[in-house]
């Protein structure tokens, strides 16, 4: 913007209290110019800047006398470049939102927003007038250790986690001062798993030691989860475990609480499962199940085993007088007969002739079921499979076809076919061909 005669007054660039510009002269090197004294008192300038709306109309003072009292505490030291201030900032001068920051050390950060970013005016050199965008102009009110005139820490967004690379503390002194003002986020853990986050804060302070503390009004929020270091896995003393930390602690085998129990029915002292009867007394598993199923105590005396039918003492066939048989039967009169005589009478309704009597018991192989036959044939076929010396696809397919009538899957003979060769014929090449050659090959 060219300076014309219509703009009569030149004032200093900014006052420390008005624009929060408490920057030392080193922030703007090479800006030593001759300045004119301000033609308004300091308090009047504050009223002019903060009591005028966007159209240049006066509005009631929002901050009252406290702002003036605060402003008067700072001496009017003049430094910076010259700016042309129009009379009372009339509405004819539009807001310039496209200005760029001329000094590269002011970092634009989403955490450095100021509620008065529209009125901050900054120049790197006398000449063009530019108004900073909110993200750039807010860095003028950077976090100094001295108290600020207007310090309204912005509310951090709830969905976005803070970026440690954009906002890091400058030095140990400013970090300690700003830690008292910023919000503290803590990871809520059980009492036995409390983690110390002081080491992470110290590492973040050391990390940001090279950057200037004058560009960040709010320090880094503590990380929501500590860094992957020894703090994430606390020592074993916090967990009360073995020296390996999370290792399982071998505990001595607890003494069985079932020692001293005894079954009130049979007197057993060991059982897979202790049960109780209706009165609450302990029963072993066998006695308890018997009592549950039959409603009475399990008999202690085992019944005598019945002698096998073949060796039943004193029993003889009423027809052939034999004493050995696989099964004793009875005839129509109720007399015991051997298995052979009883079946013969059942089939022919006459007694078996004595001429058919044999000393030995004739036995025969029972007819195997179809399922047993299939299982046996599959087993024999699998035993013969490793004996085949040549393992070629043709022999394998023939062998599997021989098993097709045994396997429940009728299509097993088609499961293994002659495999395709791994290497293509020499006549085929997979290199890049010209389209004409491909047409020739297809034809």
From Swiss-Prot:
Modified residues (Phosphoserine): 114, 161
Region (Interaction with TBX21) residue spans: 1-257
Residue segments, region Flexible linker: 288-316
Renumbered zinc finger spans (GATA-type): 263-287, 317-341
GO molecular function: cis-regulatory region sequence-specific DNA binding; DNA-binding transcription activator activity, RNA polymerase II-specific; DNA-binding transcription factor activity; DNA-binding transcription factor activity, RNA polymerase II-specific; DNA-binding transcription repressor activity, RNA polymerase II-specific; E-box binding; histone methyltransferase binding; HMG box domain binding
Family matches, as InterPro entries: TF_GATA-2/3, Transcription_factor_GATA, Znf_GATA, Znf_NHR/GATA
Any GO BP annotation: pro-T cell differentiation
Motif YxKxHxxxRP in this chain: 344-353
Effect the entry attributes to changing residue 348 to A: Dramatically decreased Th2 cell differentiation
Tissues expressed in: T-cell specific.
Cellular localisation: Nucleus
Key words of the record: Activator, DNA-binding, Immunity, Innate immunity, Metal-binding, Nucleus, Phosphoprotein, Repeat, Transcription, Transcription regulation, Zinc, Zinc-finger
Result when mutating residue 346 to A: Moderately decreased Th2 cell differentiation
Induction annotation: Up-regulated during macrophage differentiation in response to IL33.
Chain intervals for the UniProt region annotation (Disordered): 1-28, 143-180, 193-214, 412-443
This protein's domain notes: Binds DNA via the 2 GATA-type zinc fingers. Each zinc finger may bind either adjacent sites in a palindromic motif, or a different DNA molecule allowing looping and long-range gene regulation. The YxKxHxxxRP motif is critical for DNA-binding and function.
Protein role: Transcriptional activator which binds to the enhancer of the T-cell receptor alpha and delta genes. Binds to the consensus sequence 5'-AGATAG-3'. Required for the T-helper 2 (Th2) differentiation process following immune and inflammatory responses. Positively regulates ASB2 expression. Coordinates macrophage transcriptional activation and UCP2-dependent metabolic reprogramming in response to IL33. Upon tissue injury, acts downstream of IL33 signaling to drive differentiation of inflammation-resolving alternatively activated macrophages.
Subunit composition and interactions: Interacts with TBX21 ('Tyr-525' phosphorylated form).
Full protein name: Trans-acting T-cell-specific transcription factor GATA-3
């Amino acid at each position: 913007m060219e300076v014309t005669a219509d703009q009569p007054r030149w004032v200093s660039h900014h006052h420390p209290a008005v624009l929060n510009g408490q920057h030392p002269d080193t922030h703007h090197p090479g800006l030593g110019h001759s300045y004119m004294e301000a033609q308004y008192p300091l308090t009047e300038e504050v009223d002019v800047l903060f009591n005028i709306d966007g159209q240049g109309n006066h509005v009631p003072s929002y901050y009252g006398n406290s702002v003036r009292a605060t402003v008067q505490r700072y001496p009017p030291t003049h430094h910076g470049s010259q700016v042309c201030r129009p009379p009372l900032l009339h509405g004819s001068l539009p807001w310039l939102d496209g200005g760029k920051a001329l000094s590269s050390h002011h970092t634009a950060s989403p955490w450095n927003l100021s509620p008065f970013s529209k009125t901050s005016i900054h120049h790197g050199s006398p000449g063009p007038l530019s108004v900073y965008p909110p993200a750039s102009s807010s860095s003028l009110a950077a976090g100094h250790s001295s108290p600020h005139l207007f310090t309204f820490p912005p509310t951090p967004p709830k969905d976005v986690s803070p970026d440690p690379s954009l906002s890091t503390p400058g030095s140990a002194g400013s970090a300690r001062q700003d830690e008292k003002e910023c919000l503290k986020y803590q990871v809520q853990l059980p009492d036995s798993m409390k983690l110390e986050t002081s080491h992470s804060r110290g590492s973040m302070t050391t990390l940001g030691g090279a950057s200037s503390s004058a560009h960040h009004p709010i320090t880094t929020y503590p990380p929501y989860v500590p860094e992957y270091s020894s703090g994430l896995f606390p020592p074993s003393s916090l967990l009360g475990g073995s020296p390996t930390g999370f290792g399982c602690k071998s505990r001595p085998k607890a003494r069985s609480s079932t020692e001293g129990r005894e079954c009130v029915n049979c007197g057993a002292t060991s059982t897979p499962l202790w049960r109780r009867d209706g009165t609450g007394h302990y029963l072993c598993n066998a006695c308890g199940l018997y009592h549950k199923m039959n409603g009475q105590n399990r008999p202690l005396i085992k019944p005598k085993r019945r002698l096998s039918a073949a060796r039943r003492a004193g029993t003889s066939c009423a027809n052939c007088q034999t004493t050995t048989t696989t099964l004793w039967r009875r005839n129509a009169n109720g007399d015991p007969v051997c298995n052979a005589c009883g079946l013969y009478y059942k089939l022919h309704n006459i007694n078996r002739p004595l001429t058919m009597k044999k000393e030995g018991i004739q036995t025969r192989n029972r007819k195997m079921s179809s399922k047993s036959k299939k299982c046996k044939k599959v087993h024999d076929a699998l035993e013969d499979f490793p004996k085949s010396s040549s393992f070629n696809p043709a022999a394998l397919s023939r062998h599997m076809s021989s098993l097709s009538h045994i396997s429940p899957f009728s299509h097993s003979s088609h499961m293994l076919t002659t495999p395709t060769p791994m290497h293509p014929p020499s006549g085929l090449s997979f290199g890049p061909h010209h389209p004409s050659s491909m047409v020739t090959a297809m034809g």
